[in-house]
Amino acid sequence: MVDINQIPTRRPFHRRRKTCPFSGANAPKIDYKDVRLLQRYISERGKIVPSRITAVSQKKQRELAKAIKRARFLGLLPYVVR
C-alpha cells in the first residue's frame, strides 16, 4: 500500500505579477493625441487589448479606453483594421 505522506508534492507555481506601465515616477501620461502610445494597446484587428494581458491597472485601463475612443472619434486611430 502506498503511503500518502511518501508521495512528493509539487511546489505551487506563482506567476510574478506585472506592474502597471502607467504607474511610477517616470511613467508616460495617457493622452488621446499620443497615437504611438495608444497603438500599443490596440490589437491588430483594432480592438482594445484587455488589462489582464497588458497588466494595466483598472483605473488606468479606463483612462486608456477613453483616450482610444476619443482618438478614434477624432480620426487619429482607426475603428477597424482589415
Curated annotation (Swiss-Prot):
Keywords: Ribonucleoprotein, Ribosomal protein, RNA-binding, rRNA-binding. It comes from the Bacteria. The keyword Ribosomal protein applies. It holds the Pfam family Ribosomal_S18. One of its GO terms (biological process) is translation. Residues 1-20 are annotated as: Disordered. The keyword Lipid metabolism does not apply. One of its GO terms (molecular function) is small ribosomal subunit rRNA binding. Gene3D superfamilies: Ribosomal protein S18 (4.10.640.10). GO terms for cellular component: cytosolic small ribosomal subunit. HAMAP family: Ribosomal_bS18. Belongs to the bacterial ribosomal protein bS18 family. Binds as a heterodimer with protein bS6 to the central domain of the 16S rRNA, where it helps stabilize the platform of the 30S subunit. This is Small ribosomal subunit protein bS18.
